[in-house]
């Protein structure tokens, strides 16, 4: 049984890696692999089949907590984006210097990814860069810095990256421990590329027509943008605090934060027509959430837990410790 499950896991991961050539979405592959492995495990299990069902239900409870957490956090980010909340920061970027823009964009991305999540932050900042300047070597370098900064910033936060979130929710690490141990290494991971890029970009100049991000990105000033942005950031920051004080799973804090942000939005749009209110509602924000990513992680976690049940992961851990 162990050999069959290991073979299925390897085949599944290879299919995910070669998603583009085989033209099969990685979400479908992960769900199929995770589900199939549990079916094989149940069919070949020597004991009572009800024990397998109980184990699956127990593990899926943990998985559900993570999925609800991700769904809530991603919905908060979408609500902020719908209200043009991120323009509160980006519209204050005013510089004609490429070097200054490099450091400003890198710094904003680094800290924003720690408060939100690295993927959403990278998408937001790269979208802004595309509006700020035409395709060029300068934009490519800045986009590269955005990706590095987003990953570095998300690494030292319990809610900034899916990996740290998994470890935090699973109880392997604490929120304070992640920040304490990983902040300086994460900071170095962005400072070194910024310094290297600064030397490479000496002599680069901005196009004359592009004086500031605020002038290029003429965001409509929306009533409540600042309030929704601050409510979202405050709510997400409070998630680790609520967990440490109450001991409750993080998804409780995220759900409370989502309700808080939604309430702020409702207050600002309460006197508008119903069709306008719907454009700023939680339901509309949910429709913009990347649900396929959530399902992808569900499949991966199902696979991980079944491998854990047959001791493959523990044996691999012992092997790596003895080898290295």
Locations of regions flagged by a protein language model:
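Interfacial loop-to-helix junctions that mark the boundaries of transmembrane helices
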Residues: 1, 21-27, 51-64, 175-184, ...
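C-terminal ends of transmembrane helices
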Residues: 13-23, 75-91, 130-133, 196-200, ...
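Membrane-embedded alpha-helical segments and adjacent helix-loop junctions characteristic
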Residues: 50-138, 292-324
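Alpha-helical transmembrane segments and, especially, the helix-loop junctions at the ends
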Residues: 113-123, 140-171, 193-194, 198
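Transmembrane helical segments that form the transport core of multi-pass membrane transport proteins
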Residues: 83, 92, 105, 235, ...
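Hydrophobic mid-bilayer segments of alpha-helices in multi-pass membrane transport proteins
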Residues: 3-13, 23-46, 63-75, 225-235, ...
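Structural signature of hydrophobic alpha-helical transmembrane segments
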Residues: 1-8, 61-72, 113-122, 151, ...
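Juxtamembrane and boundary regions of transmembrane helices in multi-pass small-molecule transporters
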Residues: 4-6, 136, 140, 156-157, ...
């Amino acid at each position: 049984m162990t050999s069959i499950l290991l073979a299925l896991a390897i085949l599944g991961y290879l299919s995910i890696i070669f998603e583009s050539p085989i033209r099969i979405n990685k979400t479908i592959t992960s769900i199929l692999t995770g589900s199939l492995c549990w079916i094989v495990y149940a069919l070949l299990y020597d004991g009572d089949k009800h024990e397998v069902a109980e184990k699956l239900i127990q593990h899926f409870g943990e998985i559900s907590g993570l999925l609800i957490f991700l769904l809530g956090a991603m919905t908060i980010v979408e609500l902020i984006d719908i209200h043009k909340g991120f323009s509160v920061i980006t519209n204050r970027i005013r510089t004609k210097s490429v070097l200054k823009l490099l450091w400003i964009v890198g710094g904003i991305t680094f800290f924003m990814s720690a408060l939100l999540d690295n993927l959403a932050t990278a998408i937001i900042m790269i979208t802004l860069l595309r509006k700020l300047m035409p395709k060029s070597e300068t934009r490519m370098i800045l986009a590269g810095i955005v990706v590095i900064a987003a990953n570095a910033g998300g690494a030292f936060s319990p809610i900034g990256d899916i990996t740290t979130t998994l470890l935090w929710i699973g109880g392997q690490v604490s929120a304070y421990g992640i920040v304490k141990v990983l902040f300086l290494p994460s900071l170095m991971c962005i400072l070194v590329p910024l310094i290297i890029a600064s030397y490479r970009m000496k002599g680069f100049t901005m196009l004359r027509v592009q004086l500031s991000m605020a002038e290029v990105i003429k965001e409509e000033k929306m009533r409540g943008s600042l309030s929704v942005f601050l409510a979202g950031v405050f709510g997400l920051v409070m998630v680790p605090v609520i967990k440490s004080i109450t001991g409750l799973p993080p998804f409780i804090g995220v759900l409370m934060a989502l309700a808080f942000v939604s309430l702020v939005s409702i207050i600002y749009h309460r006197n508008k027509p119903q069709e306008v209110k719907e454009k700023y509602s939680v339901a509309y924000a949910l429709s913009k959430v990347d649900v396929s990513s959530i399902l992808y992680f569900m499949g991966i976690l199902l696979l991980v837990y079944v491998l854990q049940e047959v001791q493959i992961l523990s044996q691999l851990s012992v092997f790596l410790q003895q080898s290295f």
